[in-house]
């Protein structure tokens, strides 16, 4: 089993001098493989959330190894786990707060505090989201409060004999890649549930399974990652590309350290964290299926853009013909329409060139994999 993680500060945080709000962890504790990501909310209200996210990592590490995760589908046991994580994080935030009081905070301490309200005021300062995934001897389990996405990549369930360069034998909508943790409508735009919520333990979502449903990989990504890709398909493709570099934890972490700052600059400009657990044996058996999955979606994208290209080309020709009519001579609105749709046509044509180049790369990868399999037979 391979575990790895990386966190990078967002380009907007670098530019403004704000601290990185994300924290992550991946590793093995006994017979438990664990990945964790937490994202502090930031802003004046959550002024210590960069610390809160790191404390969330510590809370999960301290609690989870003492819980039998085979009980994940028992509602009472599961709720106990979530409650203990929230309570542990709360204690850690209170300890940190009183160990690091500013002079202004000391001056504002009430003589006879309302304990419950004081705890609430403290935890809000450290507010953050939390995601964790575990692979244990009996199966796997993942849970989350707040935004970000957990993406699971699964083995193909049937052994198909794929002809060379023929991807049609793999059903496009087969659930090779899923977001198994249910979504939460309360996590929208800049709104999110949080460890600092009054009833945080009841706001966790989860998924899991036994050994027979073990994923090839479980990826956790903070919202800075998924907000950079625009579509779920693009996000899933990113994680499949990461899997192709999973020769070792060191190599893939090095690649993420190179890629994430560039992604932040071009995308969300937010902090970014990825943590993952990868079953290397399952990956070796399924990497060809994943490449074919990419080929299918690339072919679909090409077909959609070809149709769009044909539509725009026909529209531009029609508008240009219309512009030759005497009654439209010098019509500025018509010329603006022609210019606009011509720019759209250029964009689609450029996108098609990029997709065609990508399809060629993927076909080369599947051919190389096929040749490697033949050489080992």
What residues fall within each predicted segment?
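Helix-loop-helix
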Residues: 58-101, 170, 238-261
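N-terminal entry segment of metal-dependent catalytic domains or homologous docking segments
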Residues: 1-65, 148, 197-208, 268-275
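Short hydrophobic beta-strand that contains or immediately precedes a catalytic carboxylate
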Residues: 35-39, 143-145, 219-221
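Conserved catalytic motifs of the protein kinase core domain
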Residues: 31-33, 138-141, 215-217
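Short beta-strand scaffold segments in enzyme catalytic cores
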Residues: 23-26, 128-135, 140-144, 149-154, ...
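C-terminal catalytic subdomain
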Residues: 192-377
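PP2C/PPM family metal-dependent serine/threonine protein phosphatase catalytic domain
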Residues: 4-18, 103-123, 127, 152-213, ...
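Flexible coil/linker segments and helix-coil junctions enriched in charged and small residues
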Residues: 94, 99-116, 165-170, 316-339, ...
């Amino acid at each position: 089993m391979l575990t790895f993680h990386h966190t990078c500060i967002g380009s907007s945080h670098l530019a403004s001098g704000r601290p990185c709000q994300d924290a992550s962890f991946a590793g093995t504790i006994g017979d438990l493989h664990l990945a964790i990501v937490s994202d502090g909310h930031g802003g004046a209200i959550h002024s210590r959330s960069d610390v809160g996210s790191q404390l969330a990592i510590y809370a999960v590490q301290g609690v989870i190894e003492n819980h039998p995760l085979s009980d994940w589908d028992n509602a009472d046991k599961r709720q106990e786990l979530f409650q203990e994580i929230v309570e542990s994080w709360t204690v850690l935030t209170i300890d940190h707060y009183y160990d690091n009081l500013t002079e202004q905070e000391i001056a504002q301490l009430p003589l006879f505090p309302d304990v419950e309200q004081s705890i609430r005021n403290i935890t809000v300062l450290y507010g953050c989201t939390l995601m964790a995934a575990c692979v244990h001897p009996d199966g796997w389990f993942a849970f989350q409060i707040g935004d970000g996405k957990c993406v699971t990549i699964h083995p193909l369930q049937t052994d198909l004999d794929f002809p060379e360069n023929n991807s049609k034998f793999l059903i496009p909508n087969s659930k090779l890649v899923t977001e198994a943790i249910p979504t939460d409508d309360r996590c929208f735009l800049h709104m999110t549930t949080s460890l600092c919520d009054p009833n945080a333990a009841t706001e966790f979502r989860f998924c899991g399974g036994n050994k027979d449903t073990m994923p090839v990989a479980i990826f956790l990504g903070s919202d800075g990652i998924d907000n950079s890709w625009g579509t779920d398909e693009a996000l899933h493709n990113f994680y499949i590309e990461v899997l192709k570099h999973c020769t070792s934890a060191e190599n893939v972490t090095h690649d993420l350290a190179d890629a994430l700052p560039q992604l932040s600059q071009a995308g969300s400009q937010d902090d970014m964290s990825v943590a993952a657990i990868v079953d290397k044996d399952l990956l070796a058996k399924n990497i060809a299926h994943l490449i074919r999955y990419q080929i299918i979606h690339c072919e679909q994208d090409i077909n959609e853009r070809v149709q769009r290209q044909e539509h725009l080309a026909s529209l531009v020709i029609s508008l240009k013909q219309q512009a030759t009519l005497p009654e439209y001579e010098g019509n500025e609105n018509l010329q603006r329409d022609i210019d606009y749709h011509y720019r759209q046509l250029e964009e689609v044509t450029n996108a098609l060139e990029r997709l065609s180049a990508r399809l060629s790369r993927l076909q080369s990868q599947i051919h190389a994999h096929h040749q490697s399999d033949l050489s080992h037979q």
